[in-house]
């Protein structure tokens, strides 16, 4: 069903299916993508992971290695009952203030609704990055400051 803005609803089985659509390969603390089109599927906060954090390929806040020139399709799922989150991409790195006040370089997800009634919110966007170092962050006050961010390397 539709939610505010770009957010849609998914059931837990739908969320599990979405998580399988990430096209990266995980090794250590890095998820590496290849090809002309890549699909990054990030979640916050999956069971068993510390709050607040992002998970990609069952890794906590991994570095994402993405080829320059690729089209990046991002799916962000909020599985964290009781809290909203966002997935935004910026050039500014840590440390992040309690009020991050960052300028996203692409229209990200905005703030997610809080999951309820067994439904989880997800949002999707497409990014065409140039080579460089970026960061994915949650803009909910205090979240990036306490570790809810990761690095993206495009080369």
From Swiss-Prot:
Provide the residue positions that the database annotates as binding Cu cation: 85, 138, 143, 148
Q: What binding details are noted for the cofactor?
A: Binds 1 copper ion per subunit.
Name the Gene3D superfamilies on file.
Answer: Cupredoxins - blue copper proteins
Organism's domain of life? Bacteria
Output the Gene Ontology cellular-component terms: periplasmic space
Q: Where in the cell is it found?
A: Periplasm
Is Iron-sulfur a UniProt keyword of this protein? no
List, separated by semicolons, the cofactors it needs: Cu cation
The alphabetized UniProt keywords are:
Copper, Electron transport, Metal-binding, Periplasm, Transport
Domain (Plastocyanin-like) ranges: 53-155
A GO term for molecular function: copper ion binding
InterPro entries with a match to the protein in the record = BlueCu_1, BlueCu_1_BS, Cu_oxidase_CS, Cupredoxin, Rusticyanin
Q: How does it assemble?
A: Monomer.
List, alphabetically, the NCBIfam families matched. Answer: rusti_cyanin
| Function comment | Electron carrier from cytochrome c552 to the A-type oxidase.
What is this protein's record name? Rusticyanin
> What is the source species?
Acidithiobacillus ferrooxidans
State the organism's lineage. Bacteria, Pseudomonadati, Pseudomonadota, Acidithiobacillia, Acidithiobacillales
